[in-house]
Amino acid sequence: MSTTRKKAPTDFRAVQVELEVKVNAPPQDVWDALVHRTTHWWRKDFYTNPETKGFHVEPRPGGRMYEDWGGDNGALWATVLTVDAPRSIQFMGHLTSQYGGPAHSIFRFAVETSGNGSLVKISDTIFGNLSEDQAARMDEGWRMLFEDGLKPYVERG
């Protein structure tokens, strides 16, 4: 038996991402898409496997946010911590070293009425091994998912 020791990550940091996205649709429609039709708006280029069949959220405490690869295969992105339907849902996720970690992420999606539509607020706190570049890309990733994914999907009806 052999043992290999590696130096602990030196890019330990905490990053806070806050984002607001205006959606021209009622809050209930936004909530429904956010937690029940995620697979329809979640960007395919964010999938971890080319064989992914769908992306799902189980909107209950202890529920999963996960990629379904078919059969019993897939990738767990996060576990649901709190649900206050149809207003907010909070998750705890993990970034493995394959995706820039190891790091933990606590993120929350909130839906509010805003004029004739909705305001989606995304808040994510990531702490762990993240390079400066990875930390900067967290904001870009959430922006792409919600501005280029959720927003046009819901607004098309």
Describe the predicted segments one by one.
Residues 1-52:
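Hydrophobic ligand-binding cavity/cleft-lining segments
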Residues 37-75:
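Short beta-edge strand/loop motif at the mouth of beta-sheet-based domains
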Residues 95-98, 123-130:
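Short, solvent-exposed aromatic-acidic interface loops
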Residues 2-3, 126-157:
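A conserved amphipathic terminal alpha-helix motif
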Residues 30-34, 65, 80, 91, ...:
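Hydrophobic pocket/interface hotspot
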Residues 19-21, 77-82, 105-113:
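Hydrophobic/aromatic beta-strand elements that line small-molecule binding cavities or substrate pockets
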Residues 64-70, 90-98:
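Short beta-strand segments that buttress and anchor functional surface loops
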